[in-house]
Amino acid sequence: MGNQELEEVFVAVIRPKNTTSLNSKEYRAKSYEILLIEVPLEGKEKKRKKVLLGTKIHADSDRTKSILEFVDETTKPISNNQGIIGKRVVHMRKFLLDGDSGGKEASLFIVPINVKDNSKSVHHPGSPSFYCLQDIMRVCSETSAHFSSSTSKMLLALDKWLAEQHTVPHAIPALFRPAPVDRVKTNVSNPAYAVEKQTDGTLHMGYTALEIKSKLMSLEKADLCIQNPLYGSDLQYTNRVDKVIINPYFGLGAPDYSKIQIPKRDKWQHSMTSVTEDKERQWVDDFPLHRSACEGDTELLSKLLDGGFSVKQLDSDHWAPIHYACWHGKVEATKLLLEKGNCNPNLLNGQLSSPLHFAAIGGHAEIVQLLLQHPEIDRHIEDQQKRSPLQVCEENKQNNWEETVNLLQQASNKPYEKVRIYRMDGSYRSVELKHGNNTTVQQIMEGMRLSQETQQYFTIWICSENLSLQLKPYHKPLQHLRMWSEIVTDLTALDPQRESPQLFLRRDVRLPLEVEKKVEDPLSILILFDEARHCLLKGFLSTSDNKLITLASLLLQIIYGNYDSKKHKQGFLNEENLKSIVPISKVKSKAHHWTNRILHEYKSLSTSEGVSKEMHHLQRLFLQNCWDIPTYGAAFFTGQVFTKASSSTHKVIRVYVGVNTKGLHLMNMETKVLHLSLEYGTFMWQLGQADQYVQIHSLENKKNFVVHTKQAGLIVKLLMKLSGQIAPNDRAVSDKYAYG
């Protein structure tokens, strides 16, 4: 017994903050808490780091029992000496350990526990505590000083694992379901069941058939047997309830029965009516916009919309105002919500039914026609049972259902609305929106009629004058266009009325430079060239004067063809022509001093026999000269840096924060001078409080920089993806705006 091999294990005890997060398909780290313990750093008693619970168990023992007992014992100091009872033990995977245990492996086990209650936990020094998982993940990286390296690796893997589980139907509810022993209500043993193993040769039965029958009859006699059709099948079930009613008097003790007055029988029905009336009155008070839409009161509806009531608000039944208007056939109310309220015509209720479904169910042909005329309508939208509006109309056959069916059938044959997808040279392609404003980035990319090879280099961006965001494949660009004012307000201090968004086909910020260097397709090279030229002229490619002159001469060769001494004299490069080949920030300050050098290099390039004059070869040569520029291929964010102007005052410098596959770059917004360029591995970052700033620490010169920006959350998430801390296509970090 004493020589049993011990296995090192780590335990992640997690609990949800509330029950609603268990049924969400979207993973949010802030919905969970994790149990960590603080330990002092070696040789630094005052500095501490957080680690996961860890222990050693016998390799051949019952792991589940050992780990649950360890959690129970470890958590007694923080739960009034009662300990925390885990629901189950789930083995996630094994990890290689660092430090003294280098080369060894340790398993990470997940122990889910009950939803967080409102009782305050007792804090004891040296005991574990619960922390919000989102707060932990914000500062977690494999090089973070806040955690041991093993804990960092495990936390990053746990975050990714939880995100994956949220995409699997019923996985999260099953993880936090009560333990099997807690779900057993009654256990009845068959008295005829023989516990002893039957010996070969002779058949021995403990009871005769008559004795068995009499014993079973004495225990329980079933008059009717109904078999559960789900038993033994692979069908998933859910424990979701339709409605919960809590007795307000529960827990108040026994009532004084002498004071209870039973009303006369003729008043019983009236009392039930009163309860219903109270509920209806409460609904009217809480949701006036819903009531006015339900009744078709357009005058009140208009006033409420002017007063700022949201058309997206869902009531206690998870319906929005437009659902009531369509259900009850209120044409003018529906029109007002769509036009004045700018309501999404594809807005879903809690059961995933759309306004078009509600209008089709009721056979309200006029409303169906109104919705089908909306430019953003999704004609092919499906409800929770995968039924189209046409199907539900034919199933219910209400009111003018035949006319409604004709309208829906005609709509399926009509041409689709289109959206313009621009390229950086100003050209565009119109793409059909087969699903209205439910059309995703992935579907638009397929509609661009690009080859599979070309598609992998580019994606859809939404851009206005001062804000550009790369969208994720599952994002719905038309909905981003609709809510652009809100996005601009959330991410900047700009006036949203001055920002007009458009959709662009641009280079994917996640595209590795090694992959781009292998691109041979002329169309892909052209699109990459147009974007690189745009960035150069805007001043985003900060590099040496010599490099800028080389790029300018290449642009002259691409635009004007071979050098002609009669046409391309010194006066040829006036200010207007310079703007098409030189960064705008250099046109007035330096470009006039470069004209001779640019023309000389242009002439050399034209007469050089070693350089192909094929257009896509010249464009590729231009890209080759851009690849070693630090900021090439970066996504740019805006922010402010405070520097000391004197001992008592601070100077505010507005900066661009560039993030690409190379690292992070700070550029002066006014002068386009590159202040800082750090490669991954040479710096650390930390997201500030309320996502309002990001702190950057250079490992080489030990300097700290703080960039104040509303886009700090986006910057950190993109840094994590491009540095490899989270997978590029991982949805583990939920972000409603950008950078997939």
Swiss-Prot record:
Q: Where in the cell is it found?
A: Cytoplasm, Cytoskeleton; Cell membrane; Cell junction
Any GO CC annotation of this UniProt entry: cytoplasm
Region N-terminal domain similar to Nudix hydrolase domain, as annotated, extends over: 1-168
Which SUPFAM superfamilies does the protein's record reference?
Answer: Ankyrin repeat (SSF48403), Second domain of FERM (SSF47031)
Q: How does it sit in the membrane?
A: Peripheral membrane protein
Iron-sulfur as a keyword? no
InterPro entries the record matches: Ankyrin_rpt, Ankyrin_rpt-contain_sf, ARM_KRIT1, Band_41_domain, FERM/acyl-CoA-bd_prot_sf, FERM_2, FERM_central, FERM_domain
Q: Does the keyword NADP apply?
A: no
Q: What happens when the gene is disrupted?
A: The heart chambers in mutant animals are huge, constituted of a monolayered myocardium lined by endocardium.
Question: PANTHER family from the xrefs?
Answer: KREV INTERACTION TRAPPED 1-RELATED, KREV INTERACTION TRAPPED PROTEIN 1
Q: How does it assemble?
A: Interacts with heg1 and ccm2; greatly facilitates ccm2-binding to heg1. Interacts with rap1.
Please give the name of this protein. Answer: Krev interaction trapped protein 1
Q: Which organism is it from?
A: Danio rerio (Zebrafish)
